Amino acid sequence: MKSEVLSVKEKIGYGMGDAASHIIFDNVMLYMMFFYTDIFGIPAGFVGTMFLVARALDAISDPCMGLLADRTRSRWGKFRPWVLFGALPFGIVCVLAYSTPDLSMNGKMIYAAITYTLLTLLYTVVNIPYCALGGVITNDPTQRISLQSWRFVLATAGGMLSTVLMMPLVNLIGGDNKPLGFQGGIAVLSVVAFMMLAFCFFTTKERVEAPPTTTSMREDLRDIWQNDQWRIVGLLTIFNILAVCVRGGAMMYYVTWILGTPEVFVAFLTTYCVGNLIGSALAKPLTDWKCKVTIFWWTNALLAVISLAMFFVPMQASITMFVFIFVIGVLHQLVTPIQWVMMSDTVDYGEWCNGKRLTGISFAGTLFVLKLGLAFGGALIGWMLAYGGYDAAEKAQNSATISIIIALFTIVPAICYLLSAIIAKRYYSLTTHNLKTVMEQLAQGKRRCQQQFTSQEVQN
């Protein structure tokens, strides 16, 4: 395929798809645990276990969705139809998940389990084809960085729109009736997400074509697993999502019980999201200046240090915490576009190794491990709060619960970032130089053995 410069309209269109996903995803990650425990009245321990089971089941569906997308043939392409036609049921189920029918406790738990599981499955139907779409819009590494930078600027804006506006919408629609407010708030946001997904469908184009798949699903899964760089990115994905999931899920508890000022939650979250916007915008110029792998592991190392430092900040130092969360927002979102480009690069690497371009199943496999990280992260919050004796009805939490909330917000993310930095520096080999070699040889129809780069040092 001849490389071409993507239009700003198409970059915005592609980014709108992830903005829509983050309107729902960030909302669920930030508010759903709190919604279930404090609004719907379900025990935290059950919610943690439900998150683990539902997300694990959903993770299993990811490879199936990827294999299905890779085998899709339509006049709209392989991936775009799923983005459009999955959007409406996704929005409807999201509203149902935030509904609070008048049921017994057992009825509430069953209802929550069913609607939450459906929500995660429909997220898969839309999001796996969407993520794979980024790998077939262009195969130019520079354009991919630009596309992903636009994507995450808009994704951050979508997440910010959802998380910052959610509580004002809850208060506006429901007033003192918080269950009605949550249901109405997510309904408004779901309509916005649907329109964004439709815009994504109509403004993007699939350009990188792969020959029709003739191998079995089992062979495709085997080929993906044999891609050593895909396995590395999968591991990095687990640690990345654990960091953001645990910190995000603990944020409302942290502001409420540690900072002691729940009314500043929106301001605290907005500070983090503004940092995210800046970080997304910095990804392209920084990777133009330095190898993306170097930027990735250095940034993760810095995130680990800052997250650990937060643990020692006094509880009453609210202004200091605002500074910390802003810097973390910048740095975390700086590495996120880079990581998604690394995912696309492993698809090219896999084709270079074995002659098969498995875009759908590659992204599905990565999202599979992402969902496992989400499952464990969500469960960890619920289990740890239950272990500490968290009680939403109490006016003050015990010391064990306070310590657990602080650790979830600081220590756990620090460990995840540190492991990401070590793994990326030591094992990820698709540097700018090495990837250029892969792309040049792919253009010439050449192949190489998978181990060629494994002993090479990361080149700046």
UniProtKB/Swiss-Prot annotation:
Residue numbers on the Periplasmic membrane side: 1-11, 54-80, 138-152, 203-248, 310, 388-403
Extract the NCBIfam families matched here. gph, PRK11462.1
Read off the InterPro entries from this record.
MFS_2, MFS_trans_sf, Na/Gal_symport, Na/Gal_symport_CS
Identify this protein by name. Inner membrane symporter YicJ
CDD domains linked = MFS_MelB_like
- Membrane topology type, per the record? Multi-pass membrane protein
Q: Name one Pfam family in it.
A: MFS_2
**Taxon lineage:** Bacteria, Pseudomonadati, Pseudomonadota, Gammaproteobacteria, Enterobacterales
Cite the Gene3D superfamilies for this sequence. MFS general substrate transporter like domains
Flavoprotein recorded as keyword:
no
Gene Ontology CC annotation, any one: plasma membrane
Q: Where are the transmembrane segments?
A: 12-32, 33-53, 81-101, 117-137, 153-173, 182-202, 249-269, 289-309, 311-331, 367-387, 404-424
The family annotation for this protein states: Belongs to the sodium:galactoside symporter (TC 2.A.2) family.
Compartments annotated for it: namely: Cell inner membrane
The species is Escherichia coli (strain K12)
Q: Does the keyword Zinc apply?
A: no
Q: Which Gene Ontology biological process is one annotated for this entry? A: carbohydrate transport
Topological domains, Cytoplasmic:
102-116, 174-181, 270-288, 332-366, 425-460
Q: Which domain of life is it from?
A: Bacteria
